[in-house]
């Protein structure tokens, strides 16, 4: 893999994770911090950089605001003070901070372990601050790289598939952005941000008197009956709907609850683009026809639009020539919504052209014809002859001042701490063989043969204390639910902690998780909740 090859070439990899995973074998140093102590650990690193005179003064003076507030905030966060909080020796924290600050280039890559906490936004703010105070932004080999959850999450976010954003990360409640998109689409747009997934589930169970009660859902390519926190609550919400439509390539657990299932096509069965975390817009070409009644998502959406009702406004069917200004969405007369676009594959090239105009500040120079020739182009790319900019933030940031705003973060405990009744911390996540909720990988006979059943990983000392052997059946219980699962010995999992993948419907880890949200990003705390682990009578001592 990329990381292993980098280690072989001499790159110093630091693994920061409550669990020691396989990549730890290739790491120069491992920071195995306590599961909710991200901010404590990161503030200690920032403190060391400032305390030992390793700050990139030119970067801070020329390109960042609020440094003095950040400095004051971490004043009491020395490695010696934070070591008992985060569980990492002070000298190790100092060593890693020095190495990060003095390297020619340092970068940070992170996954869902950073964001899936009630302090997930603060975790990200600390990572940004660490890169800023060391000047590790805007130069080759540096920067912050959030590894997105799956293919084209980046592209979907870029295109505005976020409840509080228009395309290109223009806020819905920003008056200027709102006016621009109303003119672009030729229609009135709601001024209020939408709900996130967990908030939608709450609204599905709201009283009938709530004017914002959710009574129906149309779910595409998502499996919230497995992926949402506190699944008993989420499944109850889905089951209470007046109407549920699920559009997916397989009959998922969510589809089991649906009134209507629309069979969609898989990635090789449609043409379109995907963007990754490196900001590469990539062309994907249809290689196969969809099986049976399955159809591409775009075709399904267009057919639904045509049938929404006789009094719906009519929309123009194609974009005007480039440079002539937007026209799609101007109301006319007629029945239904005409969301058809001219061209092959349901007009996918015209849809992309609309997106290119909506995201003109990022992908204006990446035309459909260019993608067909080059297959992928990196953005920002603002002209047809622009090769794309693989390095961003070289001289300014996309803020009103062009400068980075540093935001101090304080240590915030998890929403739910262990207790005498629930003494373990549960961490959920993925595993190598099964992706997310397993809707695809568990249908792969090879992968399912390698990992055919749900397991819970515990340290060997915890198995001994419970009086069970690897492979024994245990009950894991939280304040929200209980599952029975086989245990696996994993000494990389810290004592007092359980790790479970969430891919298995027969032992759905999210029956246990807490729906507490980060107040800014509105992401649930999948990475921390309190549970009890109990040896079942029939297996204890086996």
Regions found by a protein language model. Give the residues of each.
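Long, well-ordered, tryptophan-enriched scaffold segments
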Residues: 7-14, 19-103
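Extended redox/cofactor-interaction regions of prokaryotic respiratory oxidoreductases
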Residues: 1-4, 11-16, 39-43, 84, ...
């Amino acid at each position: 893999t990329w990381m292993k090859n980098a280690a072989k070439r001499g790159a110093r990899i630091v693994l920061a994770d409550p669990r020691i995973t396989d990549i730890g074998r290739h790491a120069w140093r491992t920071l195995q911090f306590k599961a909710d102590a991200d901010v404590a650990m990161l503030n200690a690193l920032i403190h060391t950089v400032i305390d030992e005179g390793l700050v990139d003064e030119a970067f801070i003076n020329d390109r960042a605001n609020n440094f003095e507030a950040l400095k004051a905030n971490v004043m009491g966060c020395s490695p010696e003070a934070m070591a008992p909080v985060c569980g990492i020796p002070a000298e190790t924290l100092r060593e890693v901070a020095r190495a990060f600050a003095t390297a020619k280039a340092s970068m940070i890559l992170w996954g869902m372990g950073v964001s899936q906490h009630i302090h997930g936004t603060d975790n990200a703010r600390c990572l940004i601050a660490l890169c800023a105070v060391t000047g590790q932004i805007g130069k080759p080999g540096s920067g912050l790289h959030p590894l997105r959850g799956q293919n084209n999450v980046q592209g979907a976010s870029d295109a505005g598939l976020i409840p509080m954003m228009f395309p290109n990360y223009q806020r819905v409640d920003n008056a200027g952005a709102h006016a621009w998109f109303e003119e672009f689409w030729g229609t009135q747009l709601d001024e209020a941000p939408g709900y996130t997934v967990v908030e939608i589930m709450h609204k599905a169970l709201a009283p009938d008197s709530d004017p914002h009660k959710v009574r129906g859902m149309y779910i595409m390519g998502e499996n919230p009956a497995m992926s949402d926190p506190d699944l008993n609550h989420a499944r109850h919400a889905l089951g209470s709907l007046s109407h549920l439509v699920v559009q997916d390539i397989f009959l998922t657990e969510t589809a089991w609850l649906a009134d209507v299932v629309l069979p969609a096509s898989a990635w090789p069965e449609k043409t379109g683009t995907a963007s990754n975390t490196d900001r590469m817009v990539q062309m994907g070409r249809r290689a196969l026809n969809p099986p049976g009644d399955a159809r591409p998502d775009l075709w399904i959406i267009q057919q639904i639009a045509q049938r929404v009702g006789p009094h719906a406004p009519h929309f123009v069917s194609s974009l005007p020539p480039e440079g002539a200004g937007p026209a799609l969405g101007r109301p006319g007369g007629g029945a239904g919504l005409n969301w058809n676009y001219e061209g092959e594959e349901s007009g996918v090239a015209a849809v992309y052209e609309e997106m290119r105009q909506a995201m003109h500040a990022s992908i204006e120079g990446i035309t459909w014809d260019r993608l067909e020739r080059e297959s992928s182009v990196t953005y920002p790319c603002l002209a047809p002859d622009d090769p794309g900019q693989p390095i961003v933030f070289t001289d300014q940031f996309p803020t009103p001042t062009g400068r980075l705003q540093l935001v101090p973060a304080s240590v915030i405990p998890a929403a739910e701490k262990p207790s005498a009744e629930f003494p373990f911390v549960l961490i959920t996540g993925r595993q190598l063989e099964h992706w997310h909720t397993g809707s695809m990988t568990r249908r792969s006979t090879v992968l399912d043969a390698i990992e055919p059943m749900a397991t819970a990983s515990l340290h060997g000392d915890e198995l001994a204390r419970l009086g069970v052997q690897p492979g024994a059946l245990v009950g894991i219980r939280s304040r929200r639910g209980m599952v029975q699962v086989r245990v696996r010995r994993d000494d990389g999992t810290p004592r007092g902690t359980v790790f479970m993948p969430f891919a298995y419907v027969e032992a759905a880890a999210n029956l246990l998780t807490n729906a507490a949200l980060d107040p800014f990003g509105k992401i649930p705390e999948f990475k921390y909740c309190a549970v009890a682990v109990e040896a079942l009578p029939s297996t204890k001592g086996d």
